[in-house]
Amino acid sequence: MRFSKAYIKTLKETPKEAEIASHKLMLRAGMIKKLASGIYAYLPLGYRTIKKIENIVREEMDRAGALELLMPVVQPAELWQESGRWDVMGPEMLRLKDRHERDFVLSPTQEEMITAIIRSDISSYKSLPINLYHIQTKFRDERRPRFGLMRGREFTMKDAYSFHTSQESLDEEFLNMRDTYTRIFTRCGLKFRPVDADSGNIGGSGSQEFQVLAESGEDEIIYSDGSEYAANIEKAVSELINPPKEELKEVELVHTPDCPTIESLAKYLDVPLERTVKALTYKDMGTDEIYMVLIRGDFEVNEVKLKNILNAVEVEMATDEEIEKIGLKKGYIGPYKLPAKIKIVADLSVPEVSNHIVGSHQKDYHYKNVNYDRDYTADIVTDIRKVRVGDNCITGGKLHSARGIECGQIFKLGDKYSKAMNATYLDEKGKTQFMLMGCYGIGVTRTMAASIEQNNDENGIIWPVSIAPYIVDVIPANIKNEVQVSLAEKIYNELQEEKIDVMLDDRDEKPGFKFKDADLIGFPFKVVVGKRADEGIVELKIRRTGETLEVSQNEVIAKIKELMRIY
């Protein structure tokens, strides 16, 4: 491709709406164009990278034995009503009607569609297992689209779905997809971690995310320095270290003026936070039921764990009005001598604290020497604790934190959708069984953005060779110098013959202008044909390292091929 013929409109200044590196650089490099909030056109330069990522995904999915198909973007509402997710998905799912007033949705995901297809065609165990995938546009009406392609409303994803007759078969395919995703992200030149994750609205029994490591990542991931353990903060667990047990004492009501928080209470009574139990009130946003949630004073509640335990769509802290309406006193809530009927969820840490301090439901008073079992119990006792950096890992070592961008996720769905949508088969004995499902997604456009977040500097993008829109930029320093132009054309043609993606910057611009564009766009290699062109010598510049090599025109192709294997 000749730069003069390419559709590349670079910008000197960063548009005001851009906040993170990938958004800024894709706009400046002329890779995307914003058309509406969270909706972008992929311009030729950006689309080349998208296609390269898609090709890597296709090659590895095909290698893993999956079969490609293409499902529609518009789906009938009946499928979502059948699965039970028509109401669960909320306003993020865009609903629409056709001219006959029939309800449809603009696809946010494809579990319902693929299950409907498979159940109509497969009826015997002999046709299973099978894994089908497609690469398709998705739409999720995000409340607050931001960060460019990182959290847009329209995006490209690879979805794969597998169907099985046994848990062993599903487990095997889950590991197959884990290995496949590892190869995909490795080939894309990314630093990443597979981490245990929450399944969210998709559901199922097991899930892992593939987190691309970047300081700008929205997700916090937890990992051990002494084992392979890694998890999203929403799912992470750690060793619970309990305070020493004490002989049980009699409950006392103590005056605690101006101590509405657990920190102020512990300071006033001169006790460690771990000897207190804080009571929080949460509301199930689906049922409006209020719960009292108990946790040791030095810990925080993991709201995702709480949501899952309650089987809630979402949970939020109850308002002051809601708390008072059920007879509780904000700032002094506790489980002992409870004045209201309310279900209690307690963290595993709570029963292990002897003689703890809790609220009394009276302003400026607390109970001390309260003990679980003797003085109160909870309806549910389970892990709802948010882990902390420095905690002991359950598999050894200490826990650390990093930021990540979720670019892929794999799930064991089990029979959630097959039961809801009656996707069955006949087993070897002729008995009807529900299929077991797996689900495997990769955000293609997000992967492009994540790569930039991980690979950039003050001058622009630094593409890995495997997904760079063009690998080499050939630049004649002086477009009016026939020797330079002739040699640049020769190298350009030779690179094309070798099937290496190459751009010839044939614009009549100053060299510095061209160099800045090349660095902004992120070509892995620049071949600058300059003053030594008459000697057959060119400069080969490596974008990632900044290194410049002087290379003979007869060796430049071989050198580029060698460097491509490294970068």
Swiss-Prot record:
Location of this chain's protein in the cell: Cytoplasm
Family: Belongs to the class-II aminoacyl-tRNA synthetase family. ProS type 1 subfamily.
Function: Catalyzes the attachment of proline to tRNA(Pro) in a two-step reaction: proline is first activated by ATP to form Pro-AMP and then transferred to the acceptor end of tRNA(Pro). As ProRS can inadvertently accommodate and process non-cognate amino acids such as alanine and cysteine, to avoid such errors it has two additional distinct editing activities against alanine. One activity is designated as 'pretransfer' editing and involves the tRNA(Pro)-independent hydrolysis of activated Ala-AMP.
Domain characteristics, as noted in the entry: Consists of three domains: the N-terminal catalytic domain, the editing domain and the C-terminal anticodon-binding domain.
Keyword Metal-binding: no
Name recorded for this polypeptide: Proline--tRNA ligase
EC number in record: 6.1.1.15
Lineage of source species: Bacteria, Fusobacteriati, Fusobacteriota, Fusobacteriia, Fusobacteriales
InterPro entries, per database record: aa-tRNA-synt_IIb (IPR002314), aa-tRNA-synth_II (IPR006195), aa-tRNA-synth_II/BPL/LPL (IPR045864), Anticodon-bd (IPR004154), Anticodon-bd_dom_sf (IPR036621), Pro-tRNA-ligase_IIa (IPR002316), Pro-tRNA-synth_IIa_bac-type (IPR004500), Pro-tRNA-Synthase_IIa_type1 (IPR023717)
Keyword Transmembrane helix: no
Pfam families found in the cross-reference section: HGTP_anticodon (PF03129), tRNA-synt_2b (PF00587), tRNA_edit (PF04073)
Catalytic reaction list: tRNA(Pro) + L-proline + ATP = L-prolyl-tRNA(Pro) + AMP + diphosphate
Record-level Gene Ontology MF annotations: aminoacyl-tRNA deacylase activity; ATP binding; proline-tRNA ligase activity
Organism: Fusobacterium nucleatum subsp. nucleatum (strain ATCC 25586 / DSM 15643 / BCRC 10681 / CIP 101130 / JCM 8532 / KCTC 2640 / LMG 13131 / VPI 4355)
